[in-house]
Amino acid sequence: MSDAQIRFPPNRLAAAISNASPTAIQACVAQAQANLKAVAGACADHVDHELGVLENNLRGWPERPEDGYLASLYEPSVSLIGAASVAGFPHLDQAARSLCDVIDGLWTNSAWEKDPIAVHVAAMRLLRRPEALG
C-alpha cells in the first residue's frame, strides 16, 4: 500500500459565507455584479477580436489536414467561453462551447470538414451582431 493520504482542507469560503450576515453577502453579490458590468465592454471587445481571429483563420483552410490548424480554431473558440456571457451574449457563449465540441470531434475522428466549423462561426457572428440580418 501507498503512504499517500487523502486530505480534505477546510472550505474557508463556505465557512465565511455561512458565518456572514445576509447584508454582507448581499453587498458582496452587488459588488460582484458591478465588477462584471465594469468589464462587459472589454469582454465585448475580446469577443469581437476572437471572432475576427476565427474568421481569418477559417479563410486559410488548408486543402489537406495540417498539424496545429484545428488548434488555431479551437484556441479562440475556447477563449470566448465565459467572456461572451459577461459581454451580454449568453447564446454566443453556448455556440462557442458547441464549436469546441465540433472541433474536438473532428480532431478526434481525424475528419477534415470545413462546413460544420464555418456554419458555427457564421452563426456566432450573427449572435454578436443580429442587426446584420437586416
Task: For the regions a language model picked out, list residue spans one by one.
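Short, mixed-charge, low-aromatic patches
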Residues: D3-R12, E50-L58, Y74-I81, C100
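Histidine kinase transmitter module recognition
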Residues: V39, A83-A84, N109
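Extended, amphipathic alpha-helices with heptad-repeat/coiled-coil or helix-bundle character
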Residues: G68-G105
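Amphipathic alpha-helix face/heptad-repeat signature
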Residues: V39, C43-E50, Y69, P76, ...
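Short, Lys/Arg-rich amphipathic alpha-helical interaction segments
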Residues: D101, G105-G134
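Regulatory/sensor and coupling segments of signal-transduction and defense proteins
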Residues: M1-A38, A123-A132
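Alpha-solenoid HEAT/Armadillo repeat architecture
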Residues: R59, E63, G82-S85, R129
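Long, amphipathic alpha-helical coiled-coil segments characteristic
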Residues: I25-A71
